[in-house]
Amino acid sequence: MTDNSKTRVVVGMSGGVDSSVTALLLKEQGYDVIGVFMKNWDDTDEFGVCTATEDYKDVAAVADQIDIPYYSVNFEKEYWDRVFEYFLAEYRAGRTPNPDVMCNKEIKFKAFLDYAMTLGADYVATGHYAQVVRDEDGIVHMLRGADNNKDQTYFLSQLSQEQLQKAMFPLGHLQKSEVREIAERAGLATAKKKDSTGICFIGEKNFKEFLSQYLPAQKGRMMTVDGRDMGEHNGLMYYTIGQRGGMGIGGQKGGDNAPWFVVGKDLSKNILYVGQGFHHESLMSTSLDASTIHFTRDMPEEFEMECTAKFRYRQPDSKVTVKVKGDKSEVIFAEPQRAITPGQAVVFYDGQECLGGGIIDQAYKDGKVCQYI
């Protein structure tokens, strides 16, 4: 039997059930476990209540229960500089960013990993639903989590081979229901705690109100693609491609009773384009350009491959051809895709393995630019 006692694993503990069970499983497997709570955002509300304080209490309770040392580290500055500034810049450019992808790349597996090394860590572990497998050459491959509904490789797609070499995902082979059962059997303080959802720094707050605190909204015209004026929009940053509703035009008909969707944006003219029907032709595209292309292991500077891809979280895979040149790529779809959204991640898969991905810049339909930005 392997003696894990000389292997130190520093666990990122959020105060939730997933990271609590992560620490418990590693402790049961004999590792030298240390828990660390990351404070990435000052989320004190108008009543002076800080949810991070409550979460840290839960971390402390679980750490005491399973008998591991624990610490708190403040990454508010790093988070602001590396994640939040990026988030604002993308919205300013009329795009729809995915801050979780950047948080994993820059905070959980960079700032936190660096901090863990100062504690003598051999590995860091998180409660992500993903799996890492080392091949005979020592290369780490990242595989989807066993729970299809919870698989989080989409959000981990920008991790490097160096980061994956130091990563452990003890929940990767489990179903979410099994994780809850383990927590309840062990009587963990977080066993019945509700899962957090949404963007961490927004929490339960109204998204529109939150964004308006940092970016001034500029109202403009809302038009159909054939030029019909549909009234005023509240600011392009509040709308995302493919969004249904929220435009205040539900009572207006355009020849049929189909619902209205956001089908495009023109940032230079501050126009929001809307159209009727889930499969409106302006929402469909046949290829995209992506940048910040990154793979989880070494790949040639220039190559072409066939694989599958996701263009948003929890979306079924789609067959694609990827043409890579440096950190940019063209992704050609086997079937037309709906609502490809600039700023979101495109993530590549070979069967169960997550190969990496990039950030969507522009969508095309039969070679013509989609009027998304």
From Swiss-Prot:
Which reaction equation describes what this protein catalyses? S-sulfanyl-L-cysteinyl-[protein] + uridine(34) in tRNA + AH2 + ATP = 2-thiouridine(34) in tRNA + L-cysteinyl-[protein] + A + AMP + diphosphate + H(+)
Say which family it is in.
Belongs to the MnmA/TRMU family.
Organism of this sequence: Streptococcus thermophilus (strain ATCC BAA-491 / LMD-9)
Q: Which GO terms describe its cellular component?
A: cytoplasm
Output the InterPro entries linked to this UniProt entry: MnmA-like, MnmA-like_C, MnmA-like_central, MnmA-like_central_sf, Rossmann-like_a/b/a_fold
Domain of life, source organism: Bacteria
Residues reported to bind ATP: 12-19, 38, 127
Please give the chief subcellular localization of this protein.
Answer: cytoplasm
Name of the protein this chain belongs to: tRNA-specific 2-thiouridylase MnmA
Q: Where is this region: Interaction with target base in tRNA?
A: 98-100
* ATP-binding keyword on record: yes
What gene is it encoded by?
A: mnmA
Q: What is the lineage of its organism?
A: Bacteria, Bacillati, Bacillota, Bacilli, Lactobacillales
Q: Where is this region: Interaction with tRNA?
A: 150-152, 312-313
